[in-house]
Regions:
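Acidic, glycine-rich flexible loop segments
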Residues: 99-150
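Edge beta-strand at a domain terminus
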Residues: 146-185
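Extracellular interdomain linker/stem segments of modular secreted and single-pass surface proteins
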Residues: 29-36
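Residue-level recognition of secondary-structure-to-loop junctions
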Residues: 1-3
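C-terminal edge beta-strand
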Residues: 22-29
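Predominantly extracellular/secreted and cell-surface proteins with exposed
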Residues: 60-121
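Short, exposed coil/turn segments at beta-strand boundaries within extracellular/luminal domains
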Residues: 16-22
C-alpha cells in the first residue's frame, strides 16, 4: 500500500472440487511521521450504544491524545471516556497503532472500565475544520472484550449506530461541545 490507512483485504481460495472459501481481514498501514490527534469534549450518546442497557442515552465526555514519539513504532498518549448514565468510565493503558489521513485519525489500544478488566478500543476522530469551515467534529469509540468461554469479541460500547458511515468522514457522533484536532505533519 502506498498510503497510511485501514484497508480491507479479502482472499478467496477455490479447491479442486470447486468449493470456495473467502476470508477477510483489516490491514493497518501506519506512518509514524504522519501526524497526531487530540481532542476533548462531549457527545450525546445515542440509545443502543451502551450494550449493557441499550435504552440508555445521554451526555458522554471524552479526552484523548495519540501520537508517535520520535523513533517509536507504537503511539503513546491517554484516552478517557465517561458515559455517566451507564456508569461507564473507560481509561486507556496501551496503544497499538495510530493512522492519520486527511481529516480523520483512528487508533486502537487497550484499557479498563471502572478500573477493572481487559478491554480493547478503537477510537475514530474527525476534524471538521479540515473538511471545511462549519463542518462539525465527529467522535467514535468502540469498546469490546473477549469472551473467555466462546473466544468471541463482545461489544460493550459503540456510539456508531449507522454502520454505513464507518470508514468515512461521517463516522461517529457529532460532538456537542469541545474540539478535535487532527495534526498532519
Amino acid at each position: 500500500f502506498s498510503a497510511a490507512g485501514l484497508y480491507n483485504v479479502t482472499v478467496s481460495v477455490t479447491d479442486s472440487s470447486g468449493l470456495t472459501s473467502t476470508v477477510g481481514r483489516q490491514v493497518v498501514v501506519y506512518d509514524p511521521s504522519a501526524g497526531f490527534v487530540t481532542g476533548g469534549g462531549w457527545i450525546m450518546s445515542p440509545a443502543g450504544a451502551y450494550k449493557a442497557d441499550e435504552r440508555l442515552s445521554g451526555r458522554a465526555t471524552f479526552g484523548f491524545v495519540s501520537k508517535y514519539l520520535k523513533g517509536a513504532n507504537k503511539p503513546t498518549g491517554e484516552t478517557e471516556f465517561r458515559f455517566q448514565a451507564g456508569v461507564l468510565n473507560f481509561y486507556s493503558n496501551n496503544y497499538d497503532w495510530l493512522v492519520v489521513g486527511g481529516a480523520r485519525a483512528q487508533y486502537k489500544g487497550t484499557g479498563v472500565i471502572n478500573g477493572r478488566g481487559s478491554y480493547q478500543f478503537l477510537l475514530t476522530a474527525v476534524d471538521g475544520d479540515l473538511i471545511g469551515k462549519g463542518t462539525a467534529d465527529r467522535f467514535r469509540i468502540k469498546i469490546w472484550h473477549r469472551d473467555d468461554s466462546t473466544n468471541a469479541d463482545v461489544t460493550d460500547y459503540d456510539n456508531q449506530i449507522n454502520s454505513t458511515a464507518a470508514g468515512s468522514d461521517q463516522e461517529g457522533t457529532v460532538i456537542g461541545g469541545g474540539s478535535i484536532s487532527v495534526k498532519i505533519r
